[in-house]
Amino acid sequence: MFLLILLSFQDRVYVPNSNKLPSWELGLELFRDNVAWSQKYPIHRNLYGTLLTQIQIEREGAVISRSAVKSCIDMLFNLSYPMPHVAFSQRPSLYLQEFEPAFLHTSVEFYRAEAEHMLERGDAAQYLRHVERRFLEEEERV
C-alpha cells in the first residue's frame, strides 16, 4: 500500500514537471522492452506464433482456452509500439503494429482455402450457411 501511495505522489508531483512517464506507463515500457519484446529472448515471436496457432486450431474445430488468448491479446493492446520521439498516448499498440497484420494474413489464407474447398462442392445454400456460421464464430472470438 505504501508503494502505491508513493508512486501516486510521484506521478502527481514529480512527473508533470520532469517530462518523464508516469509509473504505470513506465512499467509497461519496461515490461515490453525487458520481457515481452526482449532482444535476448524473442518471446514476442513465440507469443505471436502461439496465438495464431491457437486461433487456427479453434477454427478447425478444437477447443482452446479463449480466456488465455484474450488475455494475451489484451496485453498486446496495452503495450505500445516503441517509438521514442512520439508521445506515449499517441503510439500504436503492439497489437495494431505487429500482431494484427499477421493475424489478418493468416485469416485471409485460411478463409480463402476454405471457400475454394466449399465452392468445389457446388452447393451454394450450404456455402452461405457455412459463411454465416463462420461470421458468428469470428464475432464470438472478438
Label the predicted regions:
Residues M1-V142:
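Eukaryotic scaffold/interaction segments
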